[in-house]
Amino acid sequence: MGRAGGRSSYGVCEFALSWHILDGYAAATDLSGLMAVMAGRYDDDEPGSPWRVALYLDERADSTQRQALTRIFLGQLGGTPFRNFASAIGEVYAVRAARIELDHRPDAQRIDAGTYVSVRAAEAIDADGPVSCGIPGHDHPGTEVRTEHLRVDEPPMRWDVSGRCGFATDFGYRSDEA
């Protein structure tokens, strides 16, 4: 599915991932309608390329929902998130509640997580065949986009870049727990 992942374009990958849970549960805890954003970075030349991240959880979530979202997106429940990306997380700088606004519509993609993360996609990139992100285990083809801007302000992570590549797709996550 898609092109195989390889080295990041700049040797250091600075990223923001976002999720809008359309329909989801963690055990009996309803997570439908909630959102999460993860900002992070990794260095291709560092052994194992561990991710250093911050996780932002929808401020509308109650404490039980926040705990479930944290466990899911940091890979503590195993399953698809752990196999797709969370196993690469080496350090977590912060887990915070934030006002999250997402737009995942084609040609309108944007991510806002409080004052910590802001991303705007400028346009889709024409590709020959399906495109998949270099996230380990990623299994859904999607669309490559060029970013208008990607800004993260979560010490020690701080960057504001433009014209970088981005990736948009859907996800279907399941834990290893019943």
Segments the model singles out, each with a brief description of its role:
Residues 117-178:
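Extended, charged low-complexity segments
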Residues 29, 90-95, 145-151:
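Low-complexity, flexible helical/coil segments
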Residues 9-11, 47, 103:
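A generic structural signal for short, solvent-exposed coil/turn residues
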Residues 22-27, 50, 85-90, 140-143:
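Short C-terminal domain-edge/linker segments immediately following a structured domain
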Residues 1-21:
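N-terminal ordered "arm"
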Residues 49-134:
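Charged linear interaction tracts used for macromolecular binding and regulation
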Residues 2, 39-43, 98-102:
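Short amphipathic beta-strand and strand-loop transition segments with alternating hydrophobic
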Residues 17-71:
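Long, charge-rich boundary regions
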